[in-house]
Each structure stands twice: as structure tokens, then as C-alpha cells.
A protein has these predicted regions:
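N-terminal activation segment of mature serine protease catalytic domains
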Residues: 19-63, 70, 82, 249, ...
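Conserved active-site neighborhood of the chymotrypsin/trypsin-like protease fold
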Residues: 55-57, 66-144, 159-162, 220, ...
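C-terminal cap/linker of serine protease catalytic domains
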Residues: 21-38, 188-252
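Flexible, gly/ser-rich surface segments that form the specificity/activation loops bordering the active-site cleft
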Residues: 25-29, 33, 76, 116-163, ...
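Catalytic nucleophile loop of clan PA
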Residues: 63, 169-189
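Canonical tetratricopeptide repeat
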Residues: 273, 307, 341-342
Length: 346
């Protein structure tokens, strides 16, 4: 079993004001979407089913990107000898597909399904703490399930940005769509890290758009494993830092972060994890240097602002703590609330 558990589940510039059409601003403190807005998005979801040679069944979520095309995760269809989608109890079988096995993105083509497509957005201009909407068809749920969340990190990878978000996945929801608050499709939910404090990863819509330009392949063609299912040492660094970070294995985290920085010297997230490792290893001066490098590239990096605020509080620097409150609150009220909790004596 891979360390990063396969879960059957399946950001955009700020908008100044909400529109009467249901468009919502993408600022961190934006109002929650209306029920009518969410209902319109739900109409484009389908349940994806697959069967394998041993008689087993797999389930996931898909979303229509044209009246004839549905995108989902390839691992939902992997090694299947039968696949279909269903909408309000009516099933359709695909006639062809396009596959990006490496990035775990597959697009099925149908005839006569006459699906309601969503509008594809942009995954290259998203920002940390941007609100998102995840809609899935988990397990045996007969109706779509909505989860609201925020973008927590963006990882440059293979020419696009893999998104980590706070919107949790549930079993049966692989391939579910992630929307911005304008209702545009920006990512496909794909996998989670192990543990109770899991990281939830979403594949960028850029890869979906690129896949649409590729040729179709026969159904049930032999599949390949995605990048996240490789041995640990071959996985992206943004996956490799999670367990040592969450388990407090600071020396190991430093080793992984050093390797990450060697490969990507300007990576914001690599610098952040390096700073965190040095801080917890007792190297406060080095940690501060790395944190400052993060802020040079990303002045509003939430985790770094919070870490420096906690260090200021420990040093009794009341003025810096107050600046941290103001900075976090300007990004998202919830971040300041989290900071307030972190300041309380443990």
C-alpha cells in the first residue's frame, strides 16, 4: 500500500462585488455561496462506476466539461473492464477516452448523454486562502455533497500548480470538481496524505485543458500508475515533507527540505519547511533567515506570518504580535482566530 492513501473521491483574481447572477468574490472573507448557486454546479456532476476482472467495483465522481465529456481521476477507471456514468438513475457508457495516467486525469467521451457542462477556469492565478467549493458524490450517496474550504498551498509541478486545500475528501469522491467562487472549475480532487491531519491534494484544471488536445485511446487500455503512487523517494517533495512535519521528525524534515531547495532554490514551500525544521532544531537565527526569504517572495504567506508571530510572542515583542494579528486578519478572519488560539498557553 502506498503511504499516500488513495481516496475514492474525487484558485483567480479577486472580484470586487458579488453579482446578481450568483458570482461571488474570491477574497478570503467572501460570503458563502447561495443554495441556488450550488444547485447549478451540482447539475454537472455524475457518479462514475467501474468494474474489474475479479468482479470488484469502483466508484468515483465526475464532472461534465462539455455535453459529451466527463473528467475524473484515472485511478477510478484503472484496470477496469467496464465503466459508466450515471445521472439521476440513468446510466451511460463511454465510447472513447483520453488519459493522462501520470497526472491521474482521464476524460471520457459519450454519445447522447447531453450533459450540462461547467465553465473551466484558470489554475495559474490562484492565491493562498482563496475560498473554494468542492462537490462530490461520496460512497453510496444519491445526492452531491458540498464542502467549502480554502486553498492552503500551491505547489509548482510539471508546468502547473498542484493545489492543497482544506476541503476534505470522502470515500467515493475521487474525481470531484473544485470550483472558485465564480463557479469556474479550477481543479480535480484526487488524493490525501495519511493520518488524522491529512493534506488534501487537487490536480489543476490546466492539465485537463492540455489533455483535451491529446488523441483519444481505446477504452480499457492498460493503465499506468500516477506520480503520487511512486516509491517515497520518487514522489514530489511537497508530498515527502508531510509525514516528518506532522510527526515532529525535524532532522528528517530538514534533510528533505534541503534536497527540495537544491532542486528548487526559490521554492516558497521548501523555504518554509526548512525554516520550520531549523526552528524546531533550535537554530533560531537560521530559521528566521529562511522565514524572511519566504516573505520576500510571498509577503502574505500565512504559515510564515503565524510562525514569526509566535516567535515574537515568545520574545515578549507585543508590537510584532499586534502586527501579526493585523496581517492575518487582512487575509482571513479565520487565520487570526487560529493565531489567537495558538497564543494561548498550552
Amino acid at each position: 500500500m502506498p503511504k499516500f492513501l488513495l481516496m475514492s473521491l474525487l484558485l483567480a483574481s479577486l472580484t470586487a462585488h458579488a453579482q446578481d447572477t450568483g458570482v461571488f468574490p474570491n477574497s478570503s472573507n467572501a460570503a458563502a455561496p447561495s443554495e441556488d448557486f450550488l444547485y447549478q454546479l451540482k447539475e454537472s456532476l455524475v457518479k462514475v462506476s467501474s468494474t474489474v476482472k475479479n468482479g470488484g467495483h469502483g466508484y468515483g465522481t465526475g464532472v461534465a466539461i462539455s455535453k459529451d465529456h466527463v473528467v475524473t481521476n484515472c485511478h477510478v477507471l484503472q484496470d477496469s473492464n467496464g465503466m459508466s456514468i450515471s445521472k439521476w438513475g440513468v446510466a451511460f457508457a463511454p465510447v472513447a477516452m483520453i488519459a493522462d495516467w501520470e497526472h491521474d486525469i482521464c476524460i471520457m467521451r459519450f454519445e447522447w448523454a447531453d450533459l450540462k457542462p461547467v465553465q473551466m477556469g484558470d489554475s495559474e492565478n490562484l492565491h493562498y486562502e482563496q475560498p473554494i467549493v468542492s462537490i462530490s458524490m461520496p460512497g453510496d450517496s444519491p445526492a452531491p455533497y458540498v464542502t467549502l474550504g480554502k486553498i492552503k498551498a500551491l505547489y509548482p509541478f510539471d508546468g502547473a500548480n498542484v493545489m492543497r486545500a482544506s476541503a476534505a475528501f470522502a470515500i467515493g469522491a475521487s474525481g470531484s470538481p473544485v470550483f472558485d467562487y465564480n463557479g469556474k472549475l479550477i481543479a480535480i480532487s484526487t488524493l490525501k496524505s495519511p493520518g488524522q491531519k491529512a493534506y488534501f491534494y487537487n490536480m489543476p484544471i490546466k492539465w485537463v485543458k492540455e489533455l483535451l488536445t491529446k488523441p483519444e485511446i481505446p477504452l480499457y487500455q492498460a493503465s499506468k500508475s500516477p506520480f503520487w503512487d511512486a516509491p517515497d523517494e520518487a514522489r514530489p517533495f511537497f508530498m515527502r515533507v508531510v509525514l516528518p512535519y506532522q510527526n515532529g521528525q525535524w532532522a528528517e524534515l530538514k534533510t528533505v527540505a534541503q534536497a527540495w531547495l537544491k532542486q528548487e532554490p526559490t521554492s516558497t514551500e521548501a523555504l518554509y519547511y526548512m525554516a520550520t525544521a531549523e526552528q524546531n532544531l533550535g537554530n533560531a537565527k537560521l530559521a528566521n533567515q529562511y522565514y524572511q526569504q519566504v516573505l520576500k517572495q510571498h509577503p502574505n504567506h500565512p504559515a510564515t506570518l503565524m510562525a514569526l508571530g509566535l516567535l515574537a510572542n515568545k520574545a515578549g515583542n507585543v508590537a510584532e504580535v499586534e502586527k501579526t494579528h493585523l496581517a492575518l486578519k487582512a487575509i482571513d478572519d479565520a487565520l487570526d482566530e487560529e493565531f489567537i488560539e495558538a497564543l494561548k498557553p498550552q
